[in-house]
Amino acid sequence: GGSGSGETSGMWFGPRL
């Protein structure tokens, strides 16, 4: 839900770079 695309388990920031 932040700067990235890896939202898992209700996390806010999960940038999969």
From Swiss-Prot:
Residues with Leucine amide modification: 17
Domain of life, per lineage: Eukaryota
Q: Where is this chain primarily localised?
A: secreted
Keyword check for Secreted? yes
Location(s) in or outside the cell: Secreted
Q: Name one GO biological process term.
A: neuropeptide signaling pathway
What are the record keywords, sorted? Amidation, Neuropeptide, Secreted
GO molecular-function terms, A-Z: neuropeptide hormone activity
Q: Which GO terms describe its cellular component?
A: extracellular region
State which residue ranges cross the membrane: none
Similarity comment: family membership: Belongs to the pyrokinin family.
Biological role = Myoactive.
Protein name in the entry: Pyrokinin-5
Organism listed in the record:
Mastotermes darwiniensis (Giant northern termite)
